[in-house]
């Protein structure tokens, strides 16, 4: 690719969909035109490509896409790459249900879409649902233009975004504080009750386990006492065994040591049992019940103690709530004043440079044979972008009443400005029948715009007219053979024949071929 930091789809493989039994296409960078007779499966091919990215339902039993996208952060999703420029492989397998994989790692459809968000930008006749020409985009374009013209503008935008984000955070915290203030009395009562309950219990982290052990000992005290007493009685006569061993010349030191250790352990357990005799079983069970309730409510004794500390801190903050509210109020008013001042400065820049930006937009629109649109600044509620919005003025037309061809060309005009001033789109453009219902002159204008965009982004465009295929770097033909749909990348001779077909069908084939050769030669 010309800009290898941008995304590039290098291969598409499809198995068994409604049109293609088998499809395997390799792609290059730049503009790829997709042509073919009506009904052969051009839109199905594009739908398969979009299905791999989760933008459409999968239309095949298996779709596989190889993709280069060095800027994608795949490690967040557990997919590690030694080389960020190595191809990623997206696989979609459809059986009883549809499953998605990235480099053989299974992902949900939503996770895949989140990872690949913004990687594919699609222009089609269903354009208004995408709400692409919104005031956020238009304001970003104007700001990008100003930043390109005047280096003093960018620090203002950065400062406003930082201060406004801080302002929003403080306002949210103040609202929470004011909510607490409204219910301060009730909240204090509840927190004091919880504090008193936890303090009265005097919680110790190992107490619950110790009481459980005591309960266990109490439940089997008599049986254990008898067994320990009998064992100790037996151990009193074990000296006879050691004496006998020594008298016949064998060492009894190991046995003596083991018997002494056993005696000590049994005496220790006997002491525990004697201590249990002084315990009140009812009090032990009552305390265990209380601690069980605490563990159920807080998860553990440790968490309950942490909660007690938090409650004490909350009670302290409630006593200081009026002081905190006043501090928040002063800081918020200070930030508002600073943000408004920045908004005024930003507004001044926008007013100064709007005419120049409108001139550029009009020039792009004129190249695409559109009436000159213009952008008008209007006041808007303050945000991190300022206190203005841009409204698109289409002379005597409304955005909603534009034909699909007019809208697509207008969108192309803005995309050309995006490429020039924002430079933030690193994905792939997919264009569905951009030149349908256009005049030859309009189609030529669209093809030139796409050629310019293809210097920055890989583009796939279904085309019904000759201009896009003639200017395209790659030409893919979808056709039928023996009632089966196939697709292939055309060489130069095949491109001439396909463009000739698009020009004149089967009639006047010689003149059509001659014209096709001229079109291809002109773009070399």
Swiss-Prot record:
Matching Gene3D superfamilies: P-loop containing nucleotide triphosphate hydrolases
Alphabetical list of Pfam families matching this protein: SMC_N
One cellular component (GO) term of this entry: bacterial nucleoid
Keyword Nucleotide-binding (UniProt): yes
Domain of life, per lineage: Bacteria
Binding site for ATP: 36-43
Disulfide bridges in this chain: none
Keywords: ATP-binding, DNA damage, DNA repair, Nucleotide-binding
Alphabetical list of InterPro entries matching this protein: AAA+_ATPase, DNA_recomb/repair_RecN, P-loop_NTPase, RecF/RecN/SMC_N
An annotated Gene Ontology molecular function: ATP binding
A GO BP entry: DNA recombination
Family, as annotated: Belongs to the RecN family.
Function recorded in the entry: May be involved in recombinational repair of damaged DNA.
UniProt-recorded name of the protein: DNA repair protein RecN
């Amino acid at each position: 690719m010309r800009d290898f930091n941008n995304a590039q789809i290098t291969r598409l493989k499809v198995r068994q969909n409604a049109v293609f039994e088998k499809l395997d296409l390799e792609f290059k960078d730049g503009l790829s035109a997709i042509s073919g007779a009506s009904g052969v499966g051009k839109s199905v091919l594009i739908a398969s490509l979009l299905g791999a990215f989760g933008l459409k339902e999968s239309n095949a039993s298996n779709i596989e896409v190889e993709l280069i996208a060095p800027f994608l952060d795949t490690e967040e999703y557990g997919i590690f790459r030694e080389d960020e420029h190595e191809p990623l492989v997206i696989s979609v397998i459809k059986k009883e249900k549809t499953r998605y994989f990235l480099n053989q790692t299974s992902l949900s459809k939503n996770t895949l879409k989140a990872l690949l968000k913004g990687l594919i930008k699609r222009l089609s006749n269903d354009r208004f649902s995408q709400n692409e020409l919104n005031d956020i985009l238009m304001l970003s374009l104007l700001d990008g233009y100003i930043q390109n013209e005047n280096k003093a503008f960018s620090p203002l935008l950065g400062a406003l975004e930082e201060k406004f984000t801080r302002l929003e955070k403080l306002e949210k915290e103040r609202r929470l504080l004011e909510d607490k203030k409204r219910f301060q009395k009730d909240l204090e009562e509840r927190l004091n009750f919880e504090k008193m309950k936890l303090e009265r219990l005097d919680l110790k982290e190992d107490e619950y386990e110790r009481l459980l052990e005591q309960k266990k000992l109490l439940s089997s005290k008599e049986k254990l006492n008898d067994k320990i007493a009998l064992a100790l009685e037996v151990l009193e006569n074990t000296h006879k065994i050691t004496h006998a061993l020594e008298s016949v010349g064998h060492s009894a030191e190991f046995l003596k040591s083991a018997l002494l250790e056993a005696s000590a352990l049994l005496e220790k357990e006997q002491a525990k049992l004697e201590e249990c005799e002084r315990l009140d079983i009812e009090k032990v069970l009552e305390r265990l019940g209380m601690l069980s309730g605490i563990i159920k409510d807080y998860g553990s004794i440790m968490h309950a103690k942490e909660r007690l500390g938090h409650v004490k801190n909350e009670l302290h903050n409630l006593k200081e709530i009026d002081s905190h509210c006043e501090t928040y109020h002063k800081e918020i008013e200070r930030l508002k004043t600073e943000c408004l001042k920045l908004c005024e400065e930003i507004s001044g820049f926008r007013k100064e440079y709007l005419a120049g930006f409108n001139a550029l937009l009009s020039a792009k629109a004129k190249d695409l044979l559109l009436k000159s649109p213009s952008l008008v600044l209007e006041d808007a509620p303050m945000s991190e972008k300022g206190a203005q919005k841009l409204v698109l003025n289409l002379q005597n037309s409304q955005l909603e009443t534009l034909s699909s061809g007019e809208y697509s060309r207008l969108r192309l005009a803005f995309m050309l400005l995006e490429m020039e001033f924002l430079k933030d789109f690193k994905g792939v453009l997919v264009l569905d029948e951009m030149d349908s219902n256009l005049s030859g002159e309009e189609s030529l204008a669209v093809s030139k715009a796409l050629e310019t965009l293809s210097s920055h982004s890989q583009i796939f465009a279904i085309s019904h007219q000759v201009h896009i295929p003639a200017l395209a770097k790659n030409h893919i033909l979808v056709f039928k053979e023996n009632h089966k749909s196939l697709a292939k990348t055309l060489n130069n001779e095949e491109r001439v024949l396909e463009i000739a077909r698009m020009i004149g069908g089967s009639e006047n084939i010689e003149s059509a071929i001659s014209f096709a050769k001229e079109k291809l030669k002109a773009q070399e």
